Design a protein with these regions (language model features):
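N-terminal secretory signal peptides and thylakoid transit peptides that target proteins
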Residues: 35-52
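N-terminal secretory signal peptides
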Residues: 3, 8, 16-40
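Conserved SAM-binding strand-loop segment of SAM-dependent methyltransferases
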Residues: 120-125
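Beta-strand-loop-alpha-helix segment that lines the small-molecule cofactor/substrate pocket
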Residues: 143-144, 148-196, 210
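Residues forming the Rossmann-fold NAD(P)(H) cofactor-binding site
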Residues: 81, 148, 287
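Contiguous beta-strand/loop segments that form the cofactor/metal-binding neighborhood of enzyme cores
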Residues: 201-202, 214-419, 423-471
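N-terminal Rossmann-like NAD(P) cofactor-binding module of classical short-chain dehydrogenase/reductase
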Residues: 138-139
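N-terminal Rossmann-like dinucleotide-binding module
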Residues: 48-116, 194-197, 293
């Protein structure tokens, strides 16, 4: 399936107000903006049938400044309930409906909405909300294997969409999500909310300025501590009261209920550690780590991916590895990813076990949710390492939701337009494919596929009948 390449000139100059990066006067000479006339190559995923794409403006009804946007929430577990809370902080939004296949989730979310001053309709089948013409938009915070289907159907129903990351379970699904957004002229914001965080915007500005010099290597990492038994080897069990297990599975294979597959926990539900529903740490944290690099380097994708991973320590009934390492060959630099669930030591002395580092001929930069850290090379024109956490740069979620609302009104592309998240998610999915197929995966971006035969079975997401993903 062809992907049309679109050139989009991006002005990078101007006053950057890099308050997070304070170079010496000597460094200021080097800290010059890029040529504003220099174009950046963008690759927008378009429908094979010739879907029209405009670089910044969608067609469709534009809401007035005083209109409130009626929004429904599909999936109100841990993340969905959090999203409901963020949405209630945006005055232009009117939560009107919630959906979950588990009755206690519906009850909890309805109570949360009522506490915030909203009366919502609670349903068990998301199709009721999509069929309701009074609903303008939906938030999708289900397990990953539902993201693509619900997003496509919401676009077809004329709803704008906020969908959590990763965009999908497989790269093929992600492509159809972008096609649906373009075909039906919908605003689709992905939940990669770091793009609305000041730390990450400043990192992108610093990279664009050229202050780090020529960049050839980047590194991403995620570390934590877990018990050997982690989530345990729980046996299959009766379906809990109030849970529609068959609907929870949806397009995934029909299997008996298992507490770990469902993963009803306060934090990090365990469904994400089964291949039927998600992609483990690689597509959970990995998307948040790779996405800042795409934000810095113009959404470019790698030419190839090689990954290794195993369950060396953890002994539970989940599928995904406890230790993983991946190498991504981008056109002008290499990126590595490491995930250690058995060792919590953070890198670079950070007090958060996750981050992204960028290394150039003048210095290095580390960015995470706590700040931006610049480390000059010896003899560099940069002077003095800086590490700061500016409080007003930290908020991400509510500003991300406000951006979604603004774009619904103006029909502009949002900060995390679905295409950006599909790219970041697909890169992480390719790493999992490389690991599972035990092969290097070369990425043919123009045709959204890989020539490696061993990888091809993993590139196609199979849906259980009667579910079909059709744009």
């Amino acid at each position: 399936m062809a992907i049309e390449r679109v050139r989009e000139a991006v002005a990078v100059g101007g006053n950057r107000n890099l308050t997070h990066f304070r170079p010496s006067p000597a460094a200021l000479v080097y800290h010059q903006p890029m040529d504003p006339k220099q174009p950046v190559l963008r690759r927008d995923i378009l429908a094979a049938a010739g879907t029209v794409f405009t670089t910044s403006l969608f067609t469709g009804r534009v809401k007035g400044a005083n209109d409130r946007i009626a929004i429904g929430f599909l999936g109100v577990g841990t993340m969905g309930t959090a999203d409901l809370g963020y949405a209630m902080e945006v005055p232009e939004l009117q939560p009107v409906a919630i959906c979950d296949v588990y009755q206690p989730h519906r009850d909890r979310a309805a109570a949360s909405a009522q506490k915030g001053g909203f009366q919502v309709k609670a349903v068990a089948d998301f199709r009721e909300i999509l069929a309701d013409r009074s609903v303008d938009a939906v938030c999708i915070a289900t397990p990953d294997h539902w993201h693509a289907y619900m997003t496509v159907e919401a676009c077809k129903a004329g709803k704008d969409v906020y969908v959590e990351k990763p965009a999908s379970k497989g790269p093929d699904e992600g492509l159809k999500m972008v096609q649906a957004a373009r075909k039906y002229n919908r605003v689709v914001q992905a939940g990669t909310m770091q793009r609305s965080g000041g730390n990450f915007r400043k990192a992108a500005e610093l990279v664009a300025s050229g202050a780090l010099g020529e960049i050839t290597f980047c590194h991403t990492f995620q570390s934590e501590t877990t018990r050997r038994e982690r989530y345990g080897n729980l046996p299959d069990a009766p379906v809990p009261d109030g849970l529609d297990w068959d609907m929870w599975l949806g397009p995934a294979p029909a299997v008996p209920f298992n507490p770990n597959r469902w993963g009803e926990r306060i934090v990090f539900p365990t469904f994400r550690y089964f291949w039927d529903y998600a992609g483990g740490a690689m597509t959970d944290w990995g998307v948040h780590l790779i996405d800042p690099l795409h934000q810095c380097f113009g959404e470019v994708m790698p030419k190839s991916v090689t990954a290794l991973g195993e369950k060396f320590y953890v002994q539970d009934n989940c599928d995904t590895p406890d230790t993983m390492h991946a190498t991504f060959e981008y056109p002008k630099f290499l990126v590595t990813y490491e995930s250690r669930t058995c060792n919590p030591m953070p890198l670079f002395g950070l007090n958060q076990g996750a981050g992204t580092s960028i290394h150039g001929t003048e210095g290095s930069l580390v960015v995470n949710r706590r700040g931006v850290w610049v480390i000059p090379n010896a003899g560099s024109r940069l002077s003095g390492a800086t590490w700061e956490n500016i409080p007003d740069m930290t908020p991400m979620n509510v500003p991300h939701w406000k951006n979604f609302v603004e774009c619904i009104k103006t029909r502009q592309k949002p900060t995390s337009d679905i295409e950006t998240c599909v790219r970041s998610s697909s890169v992480c999915q390719l790493a999992n494919i490389s690991m599972r197929a035990k092969t290097r995966v070369d990425w043919d971006e123009a045709n959204w596929t890989s020539p490696q035969e061993a990888a091809k079975p993993y590139l196609k997401t199979v849906y259980r009948s009667p579910w079909k993903l059709e744009v």
